[in-house]
Amino acid sequence: MSRRCELTGKAVLTGHLVSHSNRKTKRRFLPNLCKVTLLSDTLGRSVRLRISANALRSVEHRGGLDAFLVKAGEQELSQNARLLKREIEKKLAEAA
């Protein structure tokens, strides 16, 4: 399982830990990932995703998982999230 957000694509970054004497040692900046269960209003079921805390805030800001996925670009989404997006768009097209 990779350390990558399924919705925003945030991943591990690398950099330096710099000491007071300006010595640099390699370090990793890990994304703040959480396993979250989100409710899809369109599909009428809950979905379990591993997303960053920042992505969770973005989902709530946009008005839920469905609204977030409809607006999101395909490139940054994981394979699981892409399938969800297609399901939601198909369901919305049927309803319209």
Swiss-Prot record:
InterPro entries listed in its UniProt record: Ribosomal_bL28, Ribosomal_bL28/bL31-like_sf, Ribosomal_bL28_bact-type, Ribosomal_bL28_sf
Gene3D superfamilies hit by this protein: Ribosomal protein L28/L24 (2.30.170.40)
Pfam families, sorted: Ribosomal_L28
GO biological process, one term: translation
Cellular component aspect of the GO annotation: cytosolic large ribosomal subunit
Top-rank taxon, per record: Bacteria
Record-stated family: Belongs to the bacterial ribosomal protein bL28 family.
Family matches, as NCBIfam families: L28
The name this protein goes by in its record: Large ribosomal subunit protein bL28
Natural source organism: Methylobacterium nodulans (strain LMG 21967 / CNCM I-2342 / ORS 2060)
